[in-house]
C-alpha cells in the first residue's frame, strides 16, 4: 500500500506541469522527491530505534493522538468531521473523546491558536485512507513539503537563471530541510504553505491575477496561521514591502523596506495601545515605546517556559540566553546574540549528537557562503533587489524570534528549517559566479 502512494505521488510530479523546474530534468526532480522519501524512513528509524519514547517523539505523538481521534469516526462520523474542520470541539460528547488525546491541550496557553491540533487533524484526515500505516502519512507529508519547495524554486529561478543547479541545491538538498521536512512534523506543512503562499503572491504582483490565486492565498494564510502563527507574522513585513514596491515603483527599494518594517514593528509593539487610540487614553511616549506591552511580556514568558522545560528534560544542547523582561531595552540588548545563535549555531564544538552534528556541518556551508559573498560579491540588479530584501527580512526576523526565546540548539535546528532555503538563496544572489569560476576553475565541473 505504501508503494501505491509512492507511485501515485511520483506520477503527479512526472505528469504535472507545475513540477517542471527550469534548468532541471524531470528525472532529477523525481530523484529529489525519492530522496525526501528515503529521509522520511531515516527519521522514522531514528525515532523508532534510537529515541524510543513515543510520548516525547513529535513524529509519533501527534500520529498516535490522530489514531485516537480517528476512533471517533466509528462512534459518529459527523462529530469526527466537526473536530477535524474545527466546527465543534466543545460539546460534551466530543470533549469527552478529545480528553483521551495526550497533546490536544497545551500546558502553556498564551491565547494563541494551539498548533498541536493542526498536525493531529492532518494525521486524522490521512488516517481515512492510510489504514494506520505510518509511512503513508510520511509520504503524503513528503509530497506536500516537496510541492512547497517546488514553489520556492519557481519563485526564485527568474532571478538566478544562470544558477539553476545551485538554486536546486539551496532549495531541495540542504540536510536540515531534507531531514526535518520529510517527517510527520509541522515543518512539512510550514514548507508547503509558505512556499505556495509566496508563489501565488508573486504571481499576483507580477500581473497574473486570477480569482483562484486569491482564493489559494487566503487558504494558505489560514494554514500558516493554524500551523505556526509566528511564521506568518515573520513573513508579513516582507510581503507588505513587496506590495508597497509594486505600487510605488522600484526607486529606493531598500529605504521602502526599512520604513515598512519600522512602521510594522512599532505597530506590533503597540498593538494593544493602538486599539485604545479612539478612547484618548494614550500619550505619544506610550505609542513609541510600547510601555507595559503584552507582546514583549509574551516573549518573556515564552522564553521562561522554554528554559523551564529544557531544564526539566535536561536538554543536552541547552544554551544560556539573555533574560528578557517586558521592556524594549532587554529585547534590543539580546537581539544580536539571538540572531547569531540561530544563524551560526550549532557549531562543531556544540555537537553532542548526530543530528546536531549534521546541523553544525550545514552551518559550515553557510559560513563558507558568507566568505564567498564577501570575496566574490556581485551587486544585485534592480529586478533582484525586492526578492533579495524579502529573503533577508524573513531570515532575520525569524532568526530574531527563535534566538530570543529558544535555549536548546536541537530545537533551534528544527525551528529555523523554513528559512534555510531563503538563507542560502541570499548568498546565491550575491555571489558572482563568473568571478568564482575564474578564480577557482575546478568548480566549473560542479556549477
Where in the sequence are the language-model features?
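Hydrophobic, aromatic-rich transmembrane alpha-helices
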Residues: 7-12, 338, 342-347, 359-382
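Transmembrane-helix motifs of polytopic, lipid-linked glycan transferases
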Residues: 12-16, 125, 137-159, 368-372
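Membrane-interface helix-loop-helix junctions at transmembrane boundaries of multi-pass membrane enzymes
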Residues: 18-19, 158, 207-212, 372-393
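Membrane-interfacial entry segments at the cytosolic side of transmembrane helices
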Residues: 24-27, 209-216, 247-263
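Extracytoplasmic catalytic/substrate-binding loops of multi-pass membrane glycan-assembly enzymes
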Residues: 51-64, 74-100, 110-122, 335, ...
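Transmembrane-helix signature of polytopic, membrane-embedded enzymes
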Residues: 131, 135, 152-173
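Membrane-interface alpha helices of multi-pass inner-membrane proteins
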Residues: 178-179, 213-235
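Short acidic/glycine- and proline-prone juxtamembrane loop motifs at membrane-interface regions
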Residues: 183-186
Amino acid at each position: 500500500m505504501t508503494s501505491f502512494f509512492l507511485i501515485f505521488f511520483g506520477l503527479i510530479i512526472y505528469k504535472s506541469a507545475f513540477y517542471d523546474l527550469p534548468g532541471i530534468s524531470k528525472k532529477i526532480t523525481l530523484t529529489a522527491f525519492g530522496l525526501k522519501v528515503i529521509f522520511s524512513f531515516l527519521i522514522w528509524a531514528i525515532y523508532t530505534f534510537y529515541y524510543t519514547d513515543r510520548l516525547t517523539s513529535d513524529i509519533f505523538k501527534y500520529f498516535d493522538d490522530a489514531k485516537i481521534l480517528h476512533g471517533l469516526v466509528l462512534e459518529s462520523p459527523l462529530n469526527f468531521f466537526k473536530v477535524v474542520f474545527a466546527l465543534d470541539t466543545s460539546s460534551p460528547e466530543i470533549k469527552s473523546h478529545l480528553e483521551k488525546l495526550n497533546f490536544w491541550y497545551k500546558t502553556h496557553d498564551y491565547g494563541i491558536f494551539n498548533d498541536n491540533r493542526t498536525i493531529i487533524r492532518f494525521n486524522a484526515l490521512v488516517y481515512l485512507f492510510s489504514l494506520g500505516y505510518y509511512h503513508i502519512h510520511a509520504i503524503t507529508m513528503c509530497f506536500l513539503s516537496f510541492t512547497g519547495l517546488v514553489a520556492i524554486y519557481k519563485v526564485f529561478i527568474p532571478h538566478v537563471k544562470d544558477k539553476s543547479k545551485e538554486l536546486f541545491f539551496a532549495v531541495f538538498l540542504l540536510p536540515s530541510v531534507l531531514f526535518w521536512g520529510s517527517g510527520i512534523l509541522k515543518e512539512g506543512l510550514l514548507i508547503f504553505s509558505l512556499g505556495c503562499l509566496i508563489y501565488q503572491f508573486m504571481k499576483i504582483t507580477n500581473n497574473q491575477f486570477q480569482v483562484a490565486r486569491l482564493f489559494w492565498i487566503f487558504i494558505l494564510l489560514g494554514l500558516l496561521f493554524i500551523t505556526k502563527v509566528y511564521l506568518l507574522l515573520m513573513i508579513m513585513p516582507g510581503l507588505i514591502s513587496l506590495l508597497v514596491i509594486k505600487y510605488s515603483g522600484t526607486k529606493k527599494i531598500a529605504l521602502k523596506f526599512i520604513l515598512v518594517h519600522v512602521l510594522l514593528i512599532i505597530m506590533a509593539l503597540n498593538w494593544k495601545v493602538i486599539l485604545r487610540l479612539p478612547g484618548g487614553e494614550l500619550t505619544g511616549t506610550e505609542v513609541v515605546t510600547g510601555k507595559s506591552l503584552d507582546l514583549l511580556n509574551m516573549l518573556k514568558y515564552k522564553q521562561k517556559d522554554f528554559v523551564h522545560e529544557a531544564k526539566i528534560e535536561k536538554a543536552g544542547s541547552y544554551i544560556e540566553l539573555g533574560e528578557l523582561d517586558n521592556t524594549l531595552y532587554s529585547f534590543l540588548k539580546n537581539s544580536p546574540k539571538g540572531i547569531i545563535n540561530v544563524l551560526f549555531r550549532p557549531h562543531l564544538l556544540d555537537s553532542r549528537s548526530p543530528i546536531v552534528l549534521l546541523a553544525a556541518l550545514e552551518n559550515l556551508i553557510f559560513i563558507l557562503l558568507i566568505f564567498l559573498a564577501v570575496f566574490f560579491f556581485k551587486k544585485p540588479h534592480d529586478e533582484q533587489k525586492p526578492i533579495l530584501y524579502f529573503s533577508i527580512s524573513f531570515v532575520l526576523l525569524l532568526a530574531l524570534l527563535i534566538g530570543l526565546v529558544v535555549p536548546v540548539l536541537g530545537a533551534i535546528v528544527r525551528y529555523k528549517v523554513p528559512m534555510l532555503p531563503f538563507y542560502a538563496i541570499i548568498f546565491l544572489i550575491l555571489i558572482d559566479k563568473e568571478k568564482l569560476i575564474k578564480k577557482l576553475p575546478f568548480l566549473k565541473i560542479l556549477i
